[in-house]
Amino acid sequence: MKLAFSTKGWHDRTFDEFCDIAADMNYEGVELHNINNEMFRDKDGAFYDYAAAATLRRVYEKKLTIACIDALCDPADAAEAEANEKELLRCVEIAVKLHIPYVRLRVGDGKREESEIFSAVSSLVSKVLPKAEKEGISLLMATTGIFSDTSKLRELLDSFASDNFGALWELSASHFTGKESPEKVIENLGAYVRH
């Protein structure tokens, strides 16, 4: 497991600045948040087609990794299932292009029934996981929302039993929301924890 920070909420920084911050703070990587921002969209962006190779070279020169892409969608939102699938498939495509091993999924804190959440998430993962498996990318469900109770996340992960579907341990959510100790998280998730 590598120590990395997310670019979430840092909209006024360049990717070079993120790399400098990570290197200065002795982090091992950076997590990319929001594939719709300028870094991916604009022709001057660090990950636009022609700039991506140079950006990756700078990352490797600083001995950093891009740990994961953080999907914006809420996989539990069944009303947005089609848009969520498109976003996750795009995340997988970008991950392949940029040699990023993981795509993070995060269930929101919306007021939905547990069965609705499991149904929506299972349906979405079953549509995206085959592409991720084919491309060697892992989908990681964060320990947030309903899944801050890591026994529920284990139940979901067990239902797929795929090497390309694992857990992303959000320390604060599992501790403060789920009220779980690190020992309990590892007891429930074990080898499913990838990041």
Predicted regions and their residues:
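Short, glycine/charged-enriched secondary-structure capping and boundary segments
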Residues: 18-20, 45-47, 82-85, 117-120, ...
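Short, surface-exposed alpha-helical segments at coil->helix boundaries
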Residues: 52-53, 122, 150
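A short acidic, helix-capping loop that chelates divalent metal ions and anchors anionic groups
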Residues: 38-43, 75-79, 109-115, 175-179
